[in-house]
Amino acid sequence: GIIPQPDWRKKESIQVFGEPRLGFLVSAGNMDSMVNHYTVSKKHRQKDSYSPGGQMGLRPDRAVIVYSNLIRQTYKKTPIILGGIEASLRRLAHYDYWENKVKHSVLLDSGADMISYGMGEHSIIEIAEALDSGLSIQDITYIPGTVCKVKSLDSVYEPTILPSYEQLKEDKLNYARSFYVQY
């Protein structure tokens, strides 16, 4: 089922269907929540064109982080996969305009297990098939177009190694090299 714009202040809002069989797919919607809420001058917008009646305040800032943490508080072990523009743009260490600093992957702040980035219509099917076959979310490290957390690179097929978050924060040239590899 789809739970559009759940109330992030009430965990009951994400419990309407009970625990899903395969996992939760979380998106901030068709527009990044920060871009939707603030102008380039960092002034708060008055209208949310993607909410009923243009009402502002129906979704939080950094929605994928907030929604995913809400789910994780309630469903401790259920797989959570992030997707959409907000998660895709923040899938790895990234510059955050709103806080004027380099931040680590949204995967770490959100408590989610995986990100399906870009046009995820193929990768999300592969993820669902893998989960349906009985694979643990921690073992799904081989699907192109995904980012996942692992304790050891031994379980990752052909990993792409990027500079650490600390290296990116301290050196703009490392940040540029990492960005180049990503794209």
List the predicted regions and their residue ranges.
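Glycine-rich beta-alpha loop elements in corrinoid/cobalamin-binding modules
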Residues: 4-183
